Amino acid sequence: MTRSKIRENVFKMLFRVEFHDKSELAEQMELLNDELTNPTDEERQYIDEKCSAIIEHMAELDALIDEKSTGWKTNRMAKVDLAIIRLAVYEIKFEDDIPTKVSINEAVELAKKYGADESGAFVNGVLAKFA
């Protein structure tokens, strides 16, 4: 599985979190893992750990996003866009092995695929403030 595909699956899990109670997190992770096509144990573990880390830091990530995004606080953002932005901001702030430009580009591509017509530009605009 490519890093882009892994990132896409992390996004899918973060999006699910918006609609389910945190007590259902383990069940949602298991459902996501069941949807994956032949993932290795290492890939499953990486996805699970990254999702858990992002969820653990969610309040901090949201505060950073609110600070940088003018006119659009996290509580007003589309859930798809917010999940993508949280993922990218987590990578920018906590994963030094991923270049910022890569995180932003991957986020924009996810926004174009899963978001509304203007999501790519919106996500790029918010994340550019983290570069």
Swiss-Prot record:
Keywords: RNA-binding, Transcription, Transcription antitermination, Transcription regulation. GO terms for molecular function: RNA binding. SUPFAM superfamilies: NusB-like. GO terms for biological process: DNA-templated transcription termination; transcription antitermination. Pfam families: NusB. InterPro entries: NusB-like_sf, NusB_fam, NusB_RsmB_TIM44. Coiled coil: none annotated. This is Transcription antitermination protein NusB. It comes from Agathobacter rectalis (strain ATCC 33656 / DSM 3377 / JCM 17463 / KCTC 5835 / VPI 0990).
